[in-house]
Amino acid sequence: MELKGKKVLVAGLGVSGIALCKVLDSLKAKVIAYDEKEYDVLKENLEEIKSLSIDFRFGKFKKEFLEGVDLVVLSPGVPTDSDIVKTAQEKKIELLGEVEFAYRFSKAPIYAITGTNGKTTTTSLLGEMFKNTGRKVYVAGNIGYPLIYAVMEAAEGDFIVAEISSFQLETIKEFKPKISCIINITPDHLDRHKTFENYRDIKGRIFENQREDEYTVLNYDDPVTWSLKNKAKCRVFPFSRKSLLENGAYIKDGSIYISVNGNAEKIIDIEEIYIPGEHNLENALAASSVAYLSGISADVIANTLKTFKGVEHRIEFVDEINGVKFYNDSKGTNPDASIKAIQALKTPIVLIAGGYDKGSEFDEFVKAFNGKVKKLILIGQTAKKIRDTARKYSYPEDDILFAGTLEEAVKKAYESAKEGDSVLLSPACASWDMFRNFEERGRIFKKAVAELRR
């Protein structure tokens, strides 16, 4: 793609947008960087690009921002029904999403992972499997390292493992992974995608350009994910925790097996997998399937599963103070993710929850408390909504506390906990009402726990 001298507008100046600006500048494009937020809000983000020859625009979108523009590249956070998108379409200006734009530069094959929950763990785990073969691998995408950086660095013989979100899949055109994977699909981001059916179909776009010599790996146990198989024009490879499969990855006699064309091979005994929980078994099956189909040996897969310790902010053990364990699950940004965290812990739980309202319902989340959650400490925009749902299912009002800050929530949680309990931050909500992102929320939680020792 020749961009020298072309006028390119980057919409959205988060992590991806900043990366796009840097790469476009290096490709000698004339870059316009736009965000609806004002400069003062974005000042910190813009530090690394402020010295580049970029034309910055902030605040409410104006049609003249697109005057003479050849290409608009959208960051994932910019909705497809926004004014900038509608205007670009009216003016017939080429419009590419960040992932689509990056894909067009890629020399290396991309192994793409999506799903509502488990994406980051599965992507990281798969990246480790590639790394442990001695291959040069880039782990990128929604995981925090922009895909555009990875494709610019990766050579033809390298590999890219990418976590891909529904926001990124909305705008693909030619994007075609070597192997794709959908771990699961449960309601999320309905404030953006409007209906669950829309959300499901956008997730299914991950394999829409793959053909018969390529694979998509799908969760056989999840009816919503498995229903997408009929749309696939490529080979479908299932994984299951519950059923024996003639062709796919499955559990038999306490071990993971993978069978391709009827030839089954044992990978590992489940008890040898380092990261705990049923949801992590699902992640292990998904990552192992993609690795095996890409030619990675059973030995390398097994050794990685024995040593991989999980990812930051996902049921991350933080500390134990006076017999009370603290876990950071700030990555629990929807009810289903937080249900999995509650299920993974075997002790009584003091739960810190609440945050930005994405339009989720919390009925299943509250039902999962199941006698395990002894105190509920609520923060953020959804605090009252979760409280009302908890009361609907007769959760004791005396066991529900509110906190104005996460630091206050941690203090209240510690005061409420006894030796043998776990304090779990698993908000079941996004972080944007109080924090820049879930990483910041997780770091503040860990700092607040450390303060308890002072």
Swiss-Prot record:
Subcellular location: Cytoplasm
Binding sites annotated in the UniProt record for ATP: G115, T116, N117, G118, K119, T120, T121
Reactions catalysed according to its record: UDP-N-acetyl-alpha-D-muramoyl-L-alanine + D-glutamate + ATP = UDP-N-acetyl-alpha-D-muramoyl-L-alanyl-D-glutamate + ADP + phosphate + H(+)
Keyword Nucleotide-binding listed: yes
Top-level taxon in the UniProt lineage: Bacteria
Single biological process term from Gene Ontology: peptidoglycan biosynthetic process
Family under the similarity heading: Belongs to the MurCDEF family.
Function recorded in the entry: Cell wall formation. Catalyzes the addition of glutamate to the nucleotide precursor UDP-N-acetylmuramoyl-L-alanine (UMA).
Protein name: UDP-N-acetylmuramoylalanine--D-glutamate ligase
Organism: Thermoanaerobacter pseudethanolicus (strain ATCC 33223 / 39E) (Clostridium thermohydrosulfuricum)
